[in-house]
Amino acid sequence: MDATKLLDNVNVVPVAVIEDKTTAVDLALTLLDAGIKAIEITLRSADALDAIELVANSVPEMTVGAGSIRQVAQLEEILNRGAQFAVSPGATGPLISTAKQLHMPFVPGAATASEILTLMNEGYMLQKFFPAEQLGGTQTLKALSAPLPEVRFFPTGGITAELAPQYLALECVTCIGGSWFIPKALLLERDFARIKEMSRSAVEITHV
């Protein structure tokens, strides 16, 4: 199931690695207060699934997604935990078919024209582009979108406050993912005042 409608009005999605699930709800509330209404919690920590469930149950105003999806079982698990969308750095046949069976809004990853075309043929018009900067950033996206104008991208990886407006200025970019405004160190220190300040700044610079 394509995730375009779900993320169409979102400019920036915080990509969070939550190592302590007890910080999840406070982080979500802080982001909401800063004007951010969606979050991608990556499955890169032992507490990730619990964090997704806590945010889904305690902060219903926040659209919560799960990132770094690699296996079919993970799609089933995040759905049970309350995730509203899923993001993967790539795509496999089993992931695509399972996401469709579960009616889970899914952002599969693509990095080449062939991968993009394959996903378009599966009905996915919003695709993750990762790692964005390492793959050539905005220049690569411009080149890929020239012969493939229908596709839209959700680039993540290496995007900074300085680069964010350049990505969002591209017609082919629906939203970007970033973690520069939710540093892991500040999250572990529970410095939500500083995270709110940085998140508000992120909202300001991404309203291009």
Predicted segments with their positions:
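Hydrophobic secondary-structure block in the mid-to-C-terminal portion of proteins
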Residues: A146-V208
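Glycine-rich phosphate-binding active-site loops on the catalytic face of alpha/beta enzymes
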Residues: F85, P89-L95, K128-G137, C172-R194
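Aromatic/hydrophobic pocket-lining residues that form π-stacking "cages" and hydrophobic walls in ligand
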Residues: L27, L95, A99, L141
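Catalytic cores of alpha/beta
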Residues: L27, Q71-R81, S114-E122, I159-T174
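Histidine/lysine/aspartate-rich catalytic loop segments that bind and position anionic ligands
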Residues: P94-L126, F130-L135
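Glycine-enriched alpha-helix->loop->beta-strand junction motifs that scaffold or abut catalytic
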Residues: L32-K37, S58-E61, N80-A86, K100-V107, ...
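Conserved N-terminal beta1-alpha1 strand-loop-helix module at the mouth
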Residues: M1-Q84, Q101, A161, E189-V208
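Glycine-rich beta-to-alpha transition loops that act as phosphate-gripper elements at the mouths
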Residues: V17-E19, A66-V72, S88-A91, P108-A113, ...
